[in-house]
């Protein structure tokens, strides 16, 4: 289905790998001009080059800036003062026991997972309202509504994403601008692949059975009993950004394979 995103300028933060990269690719597939963001210029350049080769009708652009740094973030905003779609995907996670989480760790997660995206939203939202079109999408996690206890500092920031997006959506009343949050469940990113490698390399279990074993023993509530693929998240994000999802406003949308057992 044609999503109506051709030639839209889309900024996806943290888009050199994982879910962010998959989101960027799906936007490019829809004909959007995607701004690729990451801290390492060489990683950004590789993704931009790959998108240009696969989708020559589009104009992917590079934004090699660490958006947790105010100076670098301002450079990004100067280079791209307006966008049609902002996907706040960039974030960090790390399993930690609560006793080990220092104030410095709490602050780092807050700065990275909340304040950086908030700063971009504060810049772009007024411009979207002026032209009466725009989409801001925060990528959270099922941890936002069902904390596992494995990484409280991460779960807290993802819950804050939900509240922030809902608050920002209140500013878009009677416009064609929307602000929403998407909560993916466990997804087969490079980071998760590395985690499985670490968990199972020393075991006798064949590699092709790692995923099923992980889901059975570590994500037993999942109804699909497999890891979500990044491109599945990417396709959902492009739909939420499209004109077809214009009635979605202030929503917390789940794509978790049934992992969260509650209705709401």
Model-identified regions with their sequence ranges:
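Alpha-helical segment proximal to the catalytic Tyr-Lys
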Residues: 126, 170-171, 246
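Residue(s) in the substrate-gating loop at a strand-loop-helix junction
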Residues: 141
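Conserved glycine-rich cofactor-binding loop
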Residues: 9, 16-17
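Active-site helix of classical SDR
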Residues: 121, 157, 165
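Short C-terminal tail/terminal secondary-structure segment
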Residues: 146, 238, 249-264
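Short, small/polar-rich loop/turn modules that mediate ligand/substrate recognition or access, typified
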Residues: 173, 178, 248-250
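Substrate-binding pocket helix/loop in short-chain dehydrogenase/reductase
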Residues: 73, 97-98, 105-110, 218
């Amino acid at each position: 289905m044609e999503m109506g995103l051709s030639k839209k300028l889309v900024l996806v933060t943290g888009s050199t790998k994982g879910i962010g990269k998959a989101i960027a690719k799906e936007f490019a597939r829809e004909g959007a001009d995607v701004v690729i963001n990451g801290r390492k210029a060489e990683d950004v350049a590789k993704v931009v080059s790959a998108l240009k080769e696969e989708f020559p009708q589009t104009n992917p652009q590079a934004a090699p800036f660490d958006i947790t740094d105010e100076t670098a973030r301002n450079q990004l905003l100067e280079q791209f003062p307006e966008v049609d779609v902002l996907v706040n995907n960039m974030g960090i996670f790390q399993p930690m026991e609560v006793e080990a989480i220092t104030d410095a760790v709490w602050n780092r997660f807050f700065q990275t997972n909340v304040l950086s995206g908030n700063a971009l939203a504060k810049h772009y939202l007024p411009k979207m309202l002026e032209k009466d079109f725009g989409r801001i999408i925060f990528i959270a996690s099922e941890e936002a509504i069902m904390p596992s206890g494995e990484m409280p500092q991460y779960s807290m920031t993802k819950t804050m994403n939900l509240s922030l997006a809902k608050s920002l959506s209140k500013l878009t009343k009677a416009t064609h601008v929307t602000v929403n949050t998407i909560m993916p469940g466990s997804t087969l990113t490079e980071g998760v692949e590395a985690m499985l490698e670490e968990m199972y390399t020393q075991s006798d279990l064949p590699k092709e059975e790692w995923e099923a074993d992980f889901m059975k023993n570590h994500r037993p509530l999942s109804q699909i009993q497999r890891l979500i693929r990044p491109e599945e998240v990417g396709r959902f994000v492009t739909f939420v950004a499209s004109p077809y999802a214009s009635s979605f406003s202030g929503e917390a949308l789940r794509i978790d394979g049934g992992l969260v057992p509650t209705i709401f």
